[in-house]
Structure formats: C-alpha cells, structure tokens
Amino acid sequence: MLKIIIPTIMLLPVTWFSANSMVWINITLHSLTISLMSLSFLNQTDSNSNNFSSTFFSDPLSSPLLTLTMWLLPLTIMASQHHLSKEPWERKKYFLFTLISLQLFLIMTFTATELIMFYILFESTLIPTLIIITRWGNQTERLNAGLYFLFYTLIGSLPLLVALSFIQKHMGTLNLFMMTYWSQELPNSWSSNLMWMACIMAFMIKMPLYGLHLWLPKAHVEAPIAGSMILAAILLKLGGYGMMRITTILNPLTKFMAYPFLMLCLWGMIMTSLICLRQTDLKSLIAYSSVSHMALVIVAILIQTPWSFMGATALMIAHGLTSSMLFCLANSNYERIHNRTMLLARGLQSLLPLMSTWWLLASLTNLALPPSINLIGELFITMATFSWSNMTIILTGLNMLITATYSLHMLAMTQRGKSLYHMHNLNPSLTRENTLMSMHIFPLLLLTLNPNILMGPTY
C-alpha cells in the first residue's frame, strides 16, 4: 500500500518547490506514473487480500475504486488548466496542493482496516472538497452549495460516530477483518434498528439517497471542473463502498430494514430520470443522472446477493468514468460559450467535430449501450432485483428507457441543429482536451474486454 501512499505524499512538496513553468508538467507526469503503478492492485485473483497490514489493506472491492481514484488525479489536473490560467502561481499551487491532499485522504479511506480510522478519513475528504467548491467555484451561489454539502454530510455522519462507539464498547474492536467473523447476530429490537439506521444514513446521504440528494445538484453545478469530476467519480462511491463494508456486519437486520429504502430508491430512480428530461442546465442534468444511477447501486447493495454486489461494483466504476467525462465535455462547452444552458449551445457538431465524437461516446456509455461496463452493471442489478421481486422489472426497465431518452436528448440538443450566431468564432478543441477525453473513454472500452476485474470479492 505504501508504494502509492508515499509517492502521493511526495507530490505535496513537489507542488511547492517546482519552478513555475514546470508545475503542471511535473505534477501531471508524476501523478500519472503513480496511477499506472496502482494498476497492479487490479491483479488480485481471489478474495483474500495479498496486500494488507494492520493499518491499510486492499481487496477486490477496494482495488478498482483505488485505481479509479489514482487515475482521476492527472485527469482533474489536466482539466483545470484553463480554469486556473488567470490565477497567480501561488493560488495555482494551493489548488494543486488541495487536490493532492484530497487524493491522499481518499486513498487512505479506501484502504483503512479500522472503521474509526475509515470514519475520520471519510470526514477528512469533506475539508479539501469544501475548499475547492467555495474558493474556485464560478458563481456566488457556491457558498450556499458549500453549506448544503457541509451540513448534509455532517448531520448524517454524527449518528455513525455514536454507532461506531457503541460497537467498539460491545465488541472491543472495529477491525474489519475481526468483525467479518463476528458470529453474534443483532437482535430484531428497536435499539438494533436505530443502530442500523445510524450506520447506514451517513452513506445514504453521501450516495445520495433520493430525498437526501438536494446537496448534490447544487454542489455539482457550483463546483469548478476538478470538484465536479471528483464528486461524481469518487466521493459518491465512498458511500457505496462504506455501505458494502458495513451491511455485511449488520446482517441479518438488513433484510428487515431495507424494504422502505428499496422502495424509495426505485421510486427516486424514476423521478430523477424524469427530472433529467426537464433540465435546461447541462451540469444539472448530469448531476441528476448521477442520482438516478446511484439509486440503482443502493438497491443492489441492500438486496445483499453476490450478483447484486457484482453489479454495484461494476456500475460504480463505469459511472465514475462516464460522469467525469460528461462533466469535462460540459466544461469544454462552458469555457467557449460561457453558458451552461443547452438551448444556447446548439449545432456544435459542425464547429467542433472531434469533440462531437467524444459527446457521442460519452452519451452512449451513459445510456448503457452494449457491450459497455455500464450495461453489465445495470444487467446484473436488474437480474438481482428481479429475483428479489418480479414487479421491479417494470421500474428498472422504465428507468433504462428514460435514461436512453435523456442521454440522446442531451446529445441532440448540444450537437445537432443550427448553430447560433454568437458561436461562429469558437476556439478549436485543444490536444489537452482530446487527450483528457480519450483517457476517460479508453479505460471504459478496455474494461469491456475483461470486466471480471471490477466485479468485486463475490466474483
């Protein structure tokens, strides 16, 4: 584990001590090297972790998320260059320092063995994200978005701390390895039900669960491009990862307590997809699309079958890359037109044909076109929910239909049609942008050849 944690820590002094002209090159190249080193974690053939200590470990569930976290740092740095071009060098370095420290917290969160350490690091990711949103966001509403993000997360997390203290008192340990072999089942009483709720709600808010999702569109829309990418690709997945880790400990209560949440997720999945059809703001549409996809993941985790767990891990990774790419594309439009409204950004296909290709690929992966990983994840989840209750096929099928509709609507609105007069002198697409898009889409295409490395410990 230290082979990626120590080099990431060393990126912090590199940021401050590099010459101004070399900062972007140094940080991008070094972070890309670290992300290539982290690919070795995917080569874990069985569910036993070959790489653990008493502090950090990685297994087939955390490894894909770890690799995704590492892969995204160079991409966020590349995407932010235009956004920071007019800032003084001190602020650019401060921004990179914040990004790298967030990366460090995320790596340690995904690899923590103790639940209390996981909790501390889980909360630590809040601070750099909040700084990125409130300091580098575009509009003044970013302060309101930051407040929403902060209080939703904190209100959900405090009961988790109380529940973890309670478990520590009764079991004497919060080590994940020890707790997996804890044979004592929780009794079906009010106190146990409250403890289950306390453990789960922090992760439900982070995912987010429909009804507790209001912070997400605000945070996404107001955050700079790096903030949006990390929020969509990794911070939402922290909730899914935490739920997967903690629900296995809380059995058999999950079977009794999951029903209202399953209903809410299946209902919210349809509702947020319908909201996407009505959106005019491009970033807001992609944010609501994330809520819809994450509702599927919550359903899969609560059903607690091997197939649903495989579908959840596959969909989390696929959605991380897809939504991050869509935010990059929306940002490339915003940098040229300075507007997020889809009606004012029509006909881009004739002006930026290569960018239009990236739009097509991103939209098709978002609507889960075969043979993408998104489809594999959604099919596994659909089959798992169908075996849980036959009626759910109506809702999951309808969700797939609406997802395809709004994805194609987004593509048609931005790329097709007659371009408006104010768009005729746009800057052409840059090599940096095309590299950025290809580094999002190629992992998605390559993973279709060998999806089993994403399927988690139940594969």
Swiss-Prot record:
Transmembrane intervals:
4-24, 60-80, 94-112, 116-138, 147-167, 196-216, 224-244, 256-276, 284-303, 308-330, 351-371, 375-395, 436-456
| Membrane topology (UniProt) | Multi-pass membrane protein
Task: Output the GO biological process annotations, alphabetical, semicolon-separated.
Answer: electron transport coupled proton transport; mitochondrial electron transport, NADH to ubiquinone; mitochondrial respiratory chain complex I assembly
Q: Where does the source fall among the domains of life? A: Eukaryota
Quote the catalytic activity from the record: a ubiquinone + NADH + 5 H(+)(in) = a ubiquinol + NAD(+) + 4 H(+)(out)
Where in the cell is the protein located?
Answer: Mitochondrion inner membrane
What EC numbers are recorded for this enzyme?
Answer: 7.1.1.2
The protein's UniProt keywords, in alphabetical order, are: Electron transport, Membrane, Mitochondrion, Mitochondrion inner membrane, NAD, Respiratory chain, Translocase, Transmembrane, Transmembrane helix, Transport, Ubiquinone
Give Gene Ontology CC terms.
mitochondrial inner membrane
User: One Pfam family for this entry, by name?
Assistant: Oxidored_q5_N
Molecular function GO labels: NADH dehydrogenase (ubiquinone) activity; ubiquinone binding
Give the record's family classification. Belongs to the complex I subunit 4 family.
What interactions and quaternary structure are annotated? Core subunit of respiratory chain NADH dehydrogenase (Complex I) which is composed of 45 different subunits.
Protein role? Core subunit of the mitochondrial membrane respiratory chain NADH dehydrogenase (Complex I) which catalyzes electron transfer from NADH through the respiratory chain, using ubiquinone as an electron acceptor. Essential for the catalytic activity and assembly of complex I.
This chain belongs to the protein called NADH-ubiquinone oxidoreductase chain 4
Q: Which organism is it from?
A: Lepilemur septentrionalis (Northern sportive lemur)
